[in-house]
Regions:
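C-terminal edge beta-strand
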Residues: 2-8, 90-100, 179-189, 268-277
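Proline-enriched interdomain boundary motifs that mark the N-terminal boundary
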Residues: 14-22, 103-111, 192-200, 280-287
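Short, solvent-exposed loop/linker segments at the N-terminal edge
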Residues: 24-31, 113-120, 202-208, 290-294
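Low-complexity "stalk/linker" and mucin-like segments enriched in Ser/Thr/Pro/Ala/Gly
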Residues: 26, 47-62, 138-151, 226-239
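A short beta-strand segment in extracellular, disulfide-stabilized domains
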Residues: 30-40, 119-130, 153, 208-218, ...
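Solvent-exposed loop segments of extracellular immunoglobulin-like
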Residues: 41-48, 130-139, 218-226
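Solvent-exposed segments in extracellular or luminal domains encompassing
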Residues: 62-76, 152-165, 238-253
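Short, solvent-exposed loop/turn segments at the edges of extracellular beta-sandwich modules
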Residues: 82-88, 171-177, 259-265
């Protein structure tokens, strides 16, 4: 009978630590993921919602469900638990599913560059990236300060005269080749590099060897000796003070050629003549005196 019926009220758990699960990183062509949240205690209920990005939730009331149609980038889902009249009745937690693009280009730091003082800056030309992949510039040699170390086309300031080498590192999550690196070298030439001077001409005897006296060059400028006339073997063609051997008697002419990159000054060439005299040449003899009768 109705006299034996007792009304009942649902009992909700007093507390709960509701968790939307661990963040995930995936790579195309996959566009699906499994959501795994903590299960609320009945009669509490849970519901999934899309916060940002894209995704179709198969069962938005199930803590463990499938989401399809993820987009490349960051996709955020929220697990909301309704715990009735308890303290903190509505609690939420979010999970982020980051989808990386398998077709993201491998790292390319761009072409090497030649720059001349007084400039100490240039614009880098790294390969573009497809987010959420990230790219980062770093200094391998020389100096440089990046305006934005994560921009492929950033400006780098504070270059030093000489060789400055930078790495462009691209990180692409869990995809194949997740980390690729390429390097670029920026050569900064000194606009104050001296005008080429091959040194003073030399007159020698009883030797076939001498030391050349070319003007010094400031790296990365390059100087090179070449034989223009006569004979001779230059021991180190790029040393302004190289030894030259094997010269023959007569005139031996050498050029000191300096290349100073894109600078207007400091490039060119100069010549030096090394004359080798023969120690065995006959002494002067004008012949016998002669008398002539008018």
């Amino acid at each position: 009978t109705n006299a034996n019926l007792v009304a009942s009220t649902p009992t909700f758990p007093a507390t709960g630590q509701w968790n939307a699960g661990n963040d995930q990183e995936l790579c195309t062509p996959t566009t699906n993921a499994n959501l795994v949240a903590s299960t609320p205690t009945f009669p509490a209920t849970g519901q999934w919602t899309l916060v940002s990005g894209t995704g179709s939730i198969a069962n938005d009331n199930s803590p463990s469900t499938t989401v399809t149609g993820l987009s490349v980038g960051v996709n955020v889902f929220q697990w909301t638990v309704d715990n009735g009249p308890c303290a903190n009745p509505i609690t939420t937690d979010q999970v982020t599913i980051t989808l990386f693009d398998q077709n993201n280009p491998v790292a390319n730091a761009g072409p090497d560059q030649n720059v001349c003082t007084p400039s100490t800056s240039t614009v880098l030309a790294g390969s573009a990236i497809i987010g959420p992949a990230t790219g980062t510039w770093s200094v391998l040699a020389g100096t440089g300060v990046f305006v934005d170390a994560n921009s492929p086309n950033t400006t780098v300031n504070g270059l030093t005269v000489g060789e400055n080498t930078f790495a462009w590192t691209v990180t692409n999550g869990p995809c194949a080749n997740p980390l690729t690196v390429d390097q670029v070298t920026i050569l900064l030439y000194d606009g104050n590099n001296a005008t080429p001077d091959a040194g003073a001409d030399q007159d020698l005897c009883e030797t076939t060897t001498t030391v050349l006296q070319g003007s010094a060059v400031i790296f990365p400028a390059v100087g090179t000796w070449e034989v223009d006339q006569g004979t001779g073997t230059v021991t180190d063609p790029n040393d302004p003070n190289s030894t030259v051997t094997g010269m023959g008697v007569g005139v031996n002419e050498f050029s000191w050629i300096v290349t100073n990159g894109p600078c207007a000054a400091g490039s060119g060439n100069d010549e030096v003549t090394v004359s080798i005299y023969d120690a065995d040449a006959p002494v002067a003899n004008a012949g016998q005196d002669a008398s002539v009768c008018g």
